[in-house]
Swiss-Prot record:
It is found in: Virion; Host cytoplasm; Host nucleus, Host nucleolus; Host Golgi apparatus. InterPro entries: Herpes_UL24. This is Protein UL24. Keywords: Host cytoplasm, Host Golgi apparatus, Host nucleus, Late protein, Virion. Belongs to the herpesviridae UL24 family. May participate in nuclear egress of viral particles. Plays a role in the dispersal of several host nucleolar proteins including NCL/nucleolin and NPM1. Since deletion of host NCL/nucleolin negatively impact on nuclear egress, UL24 supposedly acts on this process through its effect on host nucleoli.
Amino acid sequence: MARTGRRAAVGRPARTSSLTERRRVLLAGVRSHTRFYKAFAREVREFNATRICGTLLTLMSGSLQGRSLFEATRVTLICEVDLGPRRPDCICVFEFANDKTLGGVCVILELKTCKSISSGDTASKREQRTTGMKQLRHSLKLLQSLAPPGDKVVYLCPILVFVAQRTLRVSRVTRLVPQKISGNITAAVRMLQSLSTYAVPPEPQTRRSRRRVAATARPQRPPSPTRDPEGTAGHPAPPESDPPSPGVVGVAAEGGGVLQKIAALFCVPVAAKSRPRTKTE
């Protein structure tokens, strides 16, 4: 009995360590998924704003059924979509509003992470691939039954992607046969967004972008005045004005004072009779 107790005592730490290792691997996979969603969402936002295509969107373009990525009028990324029995990692929807027959393409993406992409085809990766393919086929059937009806062609394209946990570098891509259905892609986007259980948090605004926004919102300063040889630098120069017309000068001379100032600017002496009288005179 003592030996049995010792064996049980020895076996407990091993079981605890295996559970700890499994939990550690699971948390590492969750962090990799979150970082992947963030990087993918950044590419989608940049493409919709600037039409610049990133690495992940270029990878998705292989499922667009011969269409160019730049023909898409809008790209939407929806993460962790709750389809009931299944929850695909993310669905990337490409809308083709200018196409007469094609409404859009829904790329159903299942993500698998691995420690290293240089380890080759291991037993763990083969198991992940088998599991991922089953998950994609199940998600495809569920999405077919939930798709809103419509009169345009919509392609459902399942894709399995392996990435490295640290670098998020894509190591392997497996595409299943796409399914062609009739539906409404705009209504499908709204439906998928309502079923999403994870929203990618907005990225914090960088210091450089804040400066750029503040510079565009701040009114421009007037140009600095030129240096005055008499030491009047830093004082704003008087605003330039058009030279007065003769009629205006005549009217000002009758009021007195203005003609004298104009004559002083051109170094022209003014007759004594045109000088305005002051109290000292």
